[in-house]
UniProtKB/Swiss-Prot annotation:
One Pfam family, short name: F420H2_quin_red
Protein name: Putative F420H(2)-dependent quinone reductase Rv3178
Binding site for coenzyme F420-(gamma-Glu)n: 21-23, 27-32, 43-46, 54-58
GO molecular-function terms, A-Z: coenzyme F420 binding; oxidoreductase activity
Family the UniProt entry places it in: Belongs to the F420H(2)-dependent quinone reductase family.
């Protein structure tokens, strides 16, 4: 499979700032996103690997962070979607990037959906 082959249309990307839960160092992860009302939604797919990505594991101890979309830097609070929220939201990123469904089929873990709420 060719990565990126699942794009059905141009997909917006953002930069997510996250602080290491171990070292305290700051990092930036480029991620695909969709919007849901005033919220920004990202998916911790890690391309279907067995473990969640580092950026995702860094968010629970440090949920207040920033994202950058274009030149717009925004403060957000990262919240993992509940099972009901995930069920409602999951089809939307899959519609934007079909490979998310493939990634889910490659792993036994439920791929988390993260809601980035303005703060």
């Amino acid at each position: 499979m060719r990565l990126g082959a699942g794009f059905r249309k141009p997909v917006p990307t953002l930069l997510l700032e996250h602080r290491s839960r171990k070292s305290g160092k700051n990092f930036v992860a480029p991620l695909l996103y969709i919007t849901d009302r005033n919220n920004v939604i990202v998916v911790a797919s890690a391309l279907g690997q067995a473990e969640n990505p580092q950026w995702y594991r860094n968010l629970p101890p440090n949920p207040d962070t920033h994202i950058q979309i274009g030149s717009d830097r925004r403060p957000v609070r990262a919240v993992v979607a509940s099972s009901d929220e995930r069920a409602r939201l999951w089809p939307r990123p899959v519609d934007a990037y079909a490979d998310f469904d493939s990634c889910q089929s490659w792993t036994e873990r439920g791929i988390p959906v993260i809601i980035l709420r303005p703060r």
